[in-house]
Amino acid sequence: MKRSSGVLLPVSALPSPHGIGTFGAEAYRFIDFLAAAGQRYWQILPLGPTSVGDSPYQPFSSHAGNPYFIDLEALVRAGLLTTEEVAAPDWGNDPQRVDYGKIYAARLPLLRRAFARAGTQLRAEATAFAEENAAWLPDYALYMALRDRFGAIMRLELYSVEELRQVIQRS
């Protein structure tokens, strides 16, 4: 077996003007840097959506990806967001730290806006994704909708899944 080496760098630690590293241009630059340095591996931390405490080792789902890592500049290039919309939020003033509170407050509304502007092709891809991931996605979506509606502290064990779905439909 040939010896090789690599680097551990969380995606969140990549440079970004939007508060957190993404799978955008900086990720590609980092991969090119690794290749030029003779490194063969980029080890990353888990990519799930983080919960209270923002630890990648305590995600809401082991299947879902963290929406924070979606490249906003790619959404601008696709015409789903404007440069002004992406520049408007306060992403924090310390490039050495991720302010998860600011990220949560600003990024998710931008992603929702981008999806609302999506054309039929992207919507068809989202529908296909939902169908392909039907084993876990409906329950994850239900949980996240309940969390958004009622906050982080919920007594979900008091209700059946069907009762919870009815609560969301009424909200």
Specify the residue positions occupied by each region the protein language model found.
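Conserved AAA+ ATPase core "coupling" helix
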Residues: D148-S171
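Acidic/aromatic-lined carbohydrate-recognition and catalytic surfaces
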Residues: K2-R149
